Amino acid sequence: MKTAIFTVVLALAVFAVLSFGWEANEKALSEEFTELIHEKGAASETEARECRYFWGECHDHMPCCDWLVCRYKWPITYNICVWNRTFPEK
């Protein structure tokens, strides 16, 4: 009986140590991922948007992208950019 209790307590201690190690590794990966996202985000922020994207609000002074067209869609009370059934050329 004492051996069984000792084995269970020892197993719980091993699991606690292993889970602490996994948690530390997961936190390091999370920080690395966050840094990578911030680097990529800073690079994309430098690009200026010259047109409105899909479902963006549009007017004469805010044009849609080339493959979109500005349309009034009910029940939305303003014009939005919708697909004009063409594909952008790259």
From Swiss-Prot:
It comes from the Eukaryota. InterPro entries: Huwentoxin-1 (IPR011696). Keywords: Disulfide bond, Ion channel impairing toxin, Knottin, Secreted, Signal, Toxin. GO terms for molecular function: ion channel inhibitor activity; toxin activity. It is found in: Secreted. Disulfide bonds join C51-C65, C58-C70, C64-C81. Expressed by the venom gland. Residues 1-19 form the signal peptide. Pfam families: Toxin_12 (PF07740). GO terms for cellular component: extracellular region. Residues 20-50 form a propeptide. Ion channel inhibitor. Belongs to the neurotoxin 10 (Hwtx-1) family. 13 (Hntx-13) subfamily. The presence of a 'disulfide through disulfide knot' structurally defines this protein as a knottin. This is U7-theraphotoxin-Hhn1a 8.
